């Protein structure tokens, strides 16, 4: 994607839509799913590098969510789970498979 990409504005707007309505991720047409999967793969790799987070397969995690999993307070996210924008997650947490965490939720694992 370059600034000359005619679809750049569309993709950026669609990312915002997915951030707040992540269930739409699984119904994307193949041409849109390709860029969305790469966007998610890049963000999830960054998140796992920065925090003690493990992420299952086929998940959607909004980059506008706040995920804090410092050492000793891990967060595990199961397969086919989505986390929408403006959520705050603070480990330790074990989020199962096929869990929907919609926007503006706060989950705190409490004391370790």
Model-derived segments and spans:
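Domain-scale signature associated with acetyltransferase and cell-envelope carbohydrate enzymes
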Residues: 1-112
